[in-house]
């Protein structure tokens, strides 16, 4: 049985992720590039994201909608990654994607299982963007700044005639843009809020392996945690902002605790200095000097506490 030759209309697109390596802040890191491919024009703007979760998917879409100046009428997804989870033959959408889709008003659907011909266009675009823009491995310091430039670079790749229509792809892309739905008056805040209890050290743990410090003073308290694509925002139980951390990804455990958050406790427990993170974070000369000062201050019962308050 042959494949069905699909016909795409202006303003319709396909979405998919691919894997790329970048030198992120000096370290070679495996990331994901999200491509929103417009088969009518053969143009596919992209965004670089650290993962394929709902926050990354929706943030990439929001960034591209704002760059496009509108919202695609229909988006076809290769699979449920970042949108929901497969449950037997059905896909259960995440609450974040449901709210995001309702806010922007686009239609969505998924490729049929084992129907590779349905996603050929976007898979080809994912590969083309990777080969042309991520080889050799690019250096990235700020994902936000890199993503501001990335869609324009993808558009430059399409500055040629369409392989089947013989017309300018950028001209056809103008037709895609004219068919877009208008942007809503306000952008969608891409964040998943959840409540977590801080551990005895004042940390909250995401995905069972990424620890984020709220501070020792919040130990055992219920916290409100906001998960964004690039950040984790922590609020207290009343909704007051406590701290924001860069979001960690990967299978290895991470800990984003700030050693300076222990200074307050060291005032009350100076004997813990030897095993504190504050001590580990200091350069050798300063560490040795403070070791000597703490030893001298221990002659007085309150001396160490006075010393750490002066450091803080």
For the regions a language model picked out, list residue spans one by one.
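Acidic/histidine-rich, metal-coordinating catalytic segments
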Residues: 70-89
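Active-site-proximal acidic segments at structured loop/helix or strand boundaries
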Residues: 126-226
């Amino acid at each position: 049985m042959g494949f069905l030759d699909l016909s795409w209309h202006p303003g319709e697109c396909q979405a998919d992720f691919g894997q790329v390596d970048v030198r992120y802040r000096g370290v070679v890191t495996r990331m994901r590039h999200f491509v929103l491919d417009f088969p009518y024009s053969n143009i596919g703007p992209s965004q670089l994201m650290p993962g394929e979760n709902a926050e990354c998917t929706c943030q990439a879409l929001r960034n591209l909608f704002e760059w496009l100046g509108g919202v695609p009428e229909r988006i076809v997804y290769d699979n449920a990654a970042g949108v929901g989870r497969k449950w037997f033959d059905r896909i259960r959408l995440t609450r974040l994607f449901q709210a995001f889709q309702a806010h922007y008003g686009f239609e969505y659907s998924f490729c049929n299982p084992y129907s590779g011909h349905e996603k050929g266009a976007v898979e080809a675009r994912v590969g083309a963007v990777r080969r042309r823009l991520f080889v050799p491995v690019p250096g990235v310091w700020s994902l936000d700044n890199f993503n501001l430039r990335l869609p324009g670079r993808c558009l430059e790749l399409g500055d040629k005639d369409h392989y089947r229509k013989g017309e300018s792809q950028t001209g056809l892309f103008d037709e895609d843009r004219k068919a877009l739905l208008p942007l809503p008056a306000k952008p969608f805040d891409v964040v998943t809020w959840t409540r977590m209890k801080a551990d005895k050290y004042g940390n909250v743990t995401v995905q069972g392996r990424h620890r984020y410090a709220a501070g020792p003073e919040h130990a055992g308290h219920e916290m409100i945690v906001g998960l964004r694509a690039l950040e984790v925002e922590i609020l207290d139980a009343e909704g007051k902002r406590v701290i924001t951390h860069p979001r960690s990804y990967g299978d290895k455990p991470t800990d984003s605790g700030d050693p300076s958050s222990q200074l307050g406790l060291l005032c009350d427990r100076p004997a813990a200095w030897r095993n504190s993170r504050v001590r580990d974070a200091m350069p050798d000369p300063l560490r040795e000097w403070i070791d000597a000062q703490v030893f001298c201050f221990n002659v007085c019962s309150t001396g160490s506490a006075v010393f750490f308050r002066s450091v803080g």
